[in-house]
Amino acid sequence: MNLLDRRNFLTLTAAAGVAGASRLRAQTAKPLRGIFPIMHTPFTEDDKVDFDVLVKQAHYLHRTGVHGMVWPQLASEWASLRSEERFRGAEALVKVSNGLSPALVLGMQAPTIDEAVEYARHAERLGPDAIIAIPQTGVTDNHKLFEYYKAIGNACKRPFFVQALGGMTAEFIVEMSKAIPTLRYVKDEAGPPLPKLSFYRERHPEFHPFTGNNGKTLYEEMLRGSAGTMPGSQMPELYVEAWNLFHAGKRRQAAEMCMRTTWFLPVYETYGMAGTKYIMVLRGVFKNYLSRGGKPNVPKNGTPLDEEAKRNIKEMLDQLKPWLRA
C-alpha cells in the first residue's frame, strides 16, 4: 500500500463510530500504571489476522484484572503485520476497550518515519489511552532516533511510551523528553532494568518507568519504584496478583506470586511464540498457535512443539489453575 492509498485509508477509517469512541475515551482517562500485557496476534489457518480473536483476547485480559493492554509490539509479531492489518486491529481494539477496564496502548513503530507518522496520525484520530514505539528498524544513531520519536510525538498527542532497546540510555530518553512533552513513559529493556528504575526514581521522578522481559525481576522492580511491567498475555493474573499484593503491603504473598510468574519462563524461551500461543489455546482464547506464514514460530535453537511438549505444557499450566481467573 503506497502513501496515498494509506492516507485514503486513514480518511475512510475516521468514521463516525470511531470518532465517537475517541470522544468517549477522552472523557474517561485510565491510569497508566500496573500490569500491561503485550497482546499476541492470532492468525487464521489461511494466514490472515483473526480480528475476532484479537477482540476476544481483549475481553479475556479484562477478566484477568490487568491494568492495561498493548498491541502491536515484539510479542505481537508486529513486523509481520501489514499496514492495513494494523489500522484495522487498532480500530477494533479502541472500539472494544471503551467498555473494558484496562487502558489501551497502541504501537506506532515502523521501518520509516513516514510510516510511523501515519500510524501516529491514525492513533490521534482514534484516541487510545497511550501510544508506544519500538526504535526505528535498524537505526542506532541517537540523532536519527530522536527525529523518529519527535515525529511520532508531533503527530499524536496521547501519552507516549518509548520502548528502550539496545544501546538506548536513560539519559538519552530524558533528553528526548525535553522536546517531546508527551514522552513521560518508558518501557526499558535496554540492558538490566534495575539500575534504570533507581535512576528515574532518584533523578527524574516525573518519568514513569515500566519493564519487560516477562517480569524476571518483578519483585525488586517494585521495590525500586517501577510504574508497571509489560509481560505476555498467557498468564497475566499471576502478575496482577503479585502487583496488587505488593502494593497492599502483603510482601510475603507478593513474593510467592512472583515466583509463580517465573515458572514458565523456560517454556517461553524453549518453544518461543509457538509455546506462548499454545498456552493461549489452552486458555480458550486462541484457535491455533500459528504465526504469519501459516506455521508455528519456534526459535532457531529451540525445541519443536511436538505432542510431548504440548502434554508437558498442559501439565504445568494445570498446576497454576488455582490462581487463574479467566
Label each PLM-derived region with a short phrase:
Residues 166-269:
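Catalytic alpha/beta core domains of metabolic enzymes, predominantly
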Residues 33-44, 296:
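Generic N-terminal amphipathic, Lys/Arg-enriched alpha-helix
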